[in-house]
């Protein structure tokens, strides 16, 4: 039977306490006003959460994806907007630089990303394209020593916060044997021609920073290429695979939070003179949910 280590249990308890005492009290108002609390982000950085799966040489905690999943699950119990901010900050923001960046790029970006002093977005999804690389329309062409980028992206998390430093953009950089050559390029926020559009009015996760992006002749140095030219498709698929693990942890946490809320409601709701929790129908439903296998344990 799988069990957490003592260190992992301590991490879970620490993040759960942080979620209940710091995150939860501000969640309703943050969601209502569509505002990501930068104070909460800073405190997550102080706790080392953004650096969990990274080596200490870059400012990380020397942990792994299990540690990250534990933290995201604990946050997801009370606030999925905060949980996805951490997940995207790690999996989509810092991880591409760590996996595919040059040593110079790692030294430039990772210390601030892993400390929560900066965030980064991952510009993959487009109005008509996502993991289908063949449908990508954003282009980047070399002009002297610069990449010139044109196109648009949508639903890009952490792309417009006050501390967002850059977005990694997937773009068509050529053609190989009749197939689009996809590359990834670092585009700093504030680059002329790069616009972070107004945030979305979503049906949920409203405190998560999510924007469409547009590029109209945005020019960045050729050295901003992340990984080898043409390796973008392979690279972003590996990044998405890791991210899906973290999303599963977030979803598990959200389900646990919903179940706990349902139990609390059943105990407090009075019907025909007694608590709803005393009714067998409610008991059976809640017990079935409690005893069902968790995706985390599979």
State each model region's role:
Residues 1-86, 107-108, 112-115, 119:
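Amphipathic, small/basic residue-rich leader segments at the start of a protein or domain
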Residues 2-11, 73, 77, 194-289:
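Glycine-rich beta->alpha junctions and the first turn(s) of the following alpha-helix
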Residues 8, 19, 71, 102, ...:
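Buried hydrophobic positions in well-ordered alpha/beta secondary-structure cores of metabolic enzymes
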Residues 83-104, 130-133:
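N-terminal glycine-rich flavin-associated loop
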Residues 128-131, 157-162, 174-176, 202-209:
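Short Gly/Pro-enriched turn/cap motifs at secondary-structure boundaries
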Residues 290-298:
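Single conserved hydrophobic/aromatic residue that forms the stacking wall/gate
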């Amino acid at each position: 039977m799988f069990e957490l280590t003592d260190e992992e249990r301590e991490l879970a308890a620490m993040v759960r306490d942080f979620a209940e005492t710091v995150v939860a009290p501000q969640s309703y108002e943050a969601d209502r006003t569509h505002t990501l609390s930068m104070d909460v982000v800073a405190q997550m950085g102080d706790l080392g959460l953004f650096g969990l799966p990274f080596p200490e040489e870059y400012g990380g905690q020397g942990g792994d994806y299990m540690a990250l999943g534990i933290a995201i699950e604990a946050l997801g119990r009370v606030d999925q907007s905060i949980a996805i901010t951490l997940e995207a900050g790690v999996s989509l923001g810092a991880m591409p630089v760590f996996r595919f960046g040059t040593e110079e790029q790692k030294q430039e970006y990772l210390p601030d990303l892993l400390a929560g002093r900066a965030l980064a977005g991952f510009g993959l999804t487009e109005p008509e394209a996502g993991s289908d690389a063949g449908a990508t329309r954003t282009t980047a062409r070399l002009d002297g020593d610069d990449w010139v980028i044109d196109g648009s992206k949508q639903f890009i998390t952490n792309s417009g916060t006050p501390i967002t430093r850059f977005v990694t953009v997937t773009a068509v950089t050529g053609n190989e044997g009749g197939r689009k050559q996809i590359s990834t390029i670092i585009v700093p926020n504030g680059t002329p021609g790069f616009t972070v559009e107004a945030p979305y009015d979503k049906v949920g996760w409203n405190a998560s920073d999510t924007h469409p992006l547009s590029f109209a002749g945005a020019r960045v140095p050729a050295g901003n290429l992340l990984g080898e030219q043409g390796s973008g498709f392979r690279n972003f698929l590996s990044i998405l695979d890791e991210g899906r693990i973290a999303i599963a942890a977030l979803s598990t946490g959200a389900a646990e939070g919903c179940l706990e809320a349902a139990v609390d409601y059943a105990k407090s709701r009075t019907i025909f003179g007694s608590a709803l929790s005393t009714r067998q129908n409610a008991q059976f439903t809640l017990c079935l949910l409690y005893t069902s296998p968790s995706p985390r344990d599979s």
